[in-house]
Swiss-Prot record:
Pfam families: Ricin_B_lectin (PF00652)
GO biological process: response to cation stress
GO cellular component: cytoplasm; membrane; nucleus
Family, as annotated: Belongs to the cup family.
Region (Disordered): 1-23
Protein known as: Calcium up-regulated protein D
Amino acid sequence: MINIEDISKSSNQSEEKQLKSTSTSSKPKYSFVAKSLFKGSNNITPYYLSTSNTFQCVASESIQTWLLSDDGHIFTSSGNFVLDVSSGGYFVELVQLNSNSKTQIWTIDTTNNKIQPGNGKYLDIDSLNICVAPLNGNATQKWTTFRRAPIPTGNWGYFQSKQLDSNNNYWGLSVLNNSTSYNTSVVMNKVQAKSIGQIWQMTNDGHILSRLDGNLVLDIGPSIDGSKTNYHLNTNVYKANDLMQQWGINENNQIFNQYYPNLCIGFVGELGVDSTVNCVLAQPSSASDINFQWIANPTYSLNQIVSEVPEPFPAYTSGDLLASYQYLSDDATNGYTDDIRSLYTSINVNLEIFYVNVTNATCPSSIHSTEDFSYVQNQIKNELTYAINVRLVFDNYSGFYSKLFSQGSTNLTNLANLINVDMSSDQVVNGDYTDAITSVFYAIISEIPIGGSIIANISESAVQFGELYAESNDSGPSTYQVTLSKLYDHLNENYENEMANAQRIKNTILQDWGMMSKTFALCFLPTNNPSSLNINGLDFQKISTIASLAYQTAIIQMLLPTNYQIYFTPAGYYAPVSSDDYSYTDSTGTYIMAEIDNCNSHPPKALTGFKTRSFHIFLWLEFSYLCDLLQYGR
C-alpha cells in the first residue's frame, strides 16, 4: 500500500518539475484546512488532513493546507499532487493529476461535514491512515473545513495578543530585556520599534525562533507552583526534535505546544497596568478566551482574501435591473460601454468621474421600476467606492516599490565600485531577490511596527501570489545564482515580475465582489491593526529611507561571492577570526566575513580590496544595524 506519507516523502524537486510539465491544467481556486471531528483515544487530540497522514495542527502550514480547484480536484499546497482513491478503492493517495479520473473529483459538503470522492464513498480515518468507506455515521467521517490563521513560516514578525490595553495598544510576545542568554523569561511588552526581542520566526518544523540569536527559540519554562498544566515560558538553545520547543497555531488563533497539545500560550495580569506582563503556558478557559488568542503581524491579510472562494458581482440578466445597469454604465462612461464593471481594472479611466456620473444619474422613462433603478445605482456606487480605494492602496504601493528600485542600476554600480567588484566579470554571486525583499520588509516592520505591516502585507502577498502564478506559467520571482555581469538584468526582471504580481492581485480583487468588499474593509481599519491596509497618515518618506538602506545591504550581500557570507558572534563568546581585516566588533558582538561552510576560512588574497573596503562601506551604512539584517535575512 502506498499511503499519503509514503508519497509525500518520496517526492523531490525533479519529480515536481516533471509533474508541472506533464499534468493537465486545473487551476486551484482557494485553500482550506480539513479538521476531523474525531478526537482520538483521549477524546481531546485534534487531527487534520495532512500530507503526512492525520496529525495535530502543526506549524508547517503547507502540509495541512489544500487547494480546491473549481472542478473538484484537491491539490497539495504546492499544486503538484492531487488526492485520489487507490486502485483497491480504500486508501487515499497523492498522485499526478488525471482529469479523466472520477476518483480524483471530490465534493466538500460543509452542511453535513462530509468529504466525498467521485465513487460515492466518504473520506474516513483508519488507524490514522486516510481512506474512503461507505457512510457509517462515525466521527471519523466528519470533517470541518476552514481557512487556518496565517502562520508566518519563514518570515520575521510579531506575535501580538488580540487583547488590547485600555489605550488600544498592541502587546507582543517578548524576550525579557532583549537578553540573548538562555533560560530568559518570555513576557508581554507593548509592541515598539527597534525591540528586536519582540520579533520571531515560525520555522517549518514548528520552532519559534527569536530574532536575538540564530540558536535561541521559545521553550517551556519551569512549572508554576508545581502544576502540571501551568508553566512559565523561557528561551533556550535550539533542539531539533524536542516537542517542548515545537508549536502550532489552531483555528482559534491559539499557539499550542506539541508536547502538551491542550496547553496554549497566554498571559496573566492586565495589559497596560504594568510595563511587563508574564506569559504562561496553560489551558484556555474556552476557544474564545482572548487572553490566549494571537495575531501574527504582518498578517498577510491579502493572502487569505485572494485565496477565498470567488463571489461574483450581483447579476443583472433581464428586465429593469439589466436595463438600469446598462443605462448607468453608458451614462457614467459617456457612451464608452454598457458594462462598467469591465473597466474597474483599466488604468486609463477615472473611476471618481464615473462615481459622480452614477450619483447624478436619474431614472429614464424607458425604465419602469424606479426601485430597480435605485437598487442598481446604489450597488454600482458601492462598487466604485470600493474599487477607488483598492486601486489607491495598490497605486501607493507601486509608487513606493518603483521609488525603491528606480535607481537600481546606479546603486548597484556605485556599491560595486566602492568595494572594488568588477560588474563585468563572470564571478558567480547569489542573486536571491526574495531574500533581498525579505530583508527590506523585515527592516520596515522592525523600525515601524505600527504601519510598516501595511507595506509588508502587500509585498509578501505579491511574492506568494507570484510563486503560485509561476507554477502554472513559468513566470515570477526566481532565486538562483548568476554572474556579476548578469546581476542587474536578473534583479530588474524580478522587480518587473513583482510589480506584475501586485497588478495581478489588484485585478483579481477588482473582478470579484467578495474580495473587493473584504479588501475595502481593511482599508479603513486603524493603522495599528496588523491586518490594516489603511495608508492614511503613513510616512512614506521614512518607510522609503529604511527600505532603501536595507536594500543596499542586501545588494552588498549579493556582491559577495556565493561561498562567502557574514557571520555574527554575540559579545562574550569566542569569535573565530584571525585578522581584523575580516571582522568588525562593537558592543553587541563580532561580525566576520568567511566561507559559508567554514567560518575560519576567509576570502583569498585576491579579494583583499573587496574585503576591507566592504567593511568600511558597512560602517558607512550603520554597520551594526545592517549586519543584524544580514545575520538573519538570508
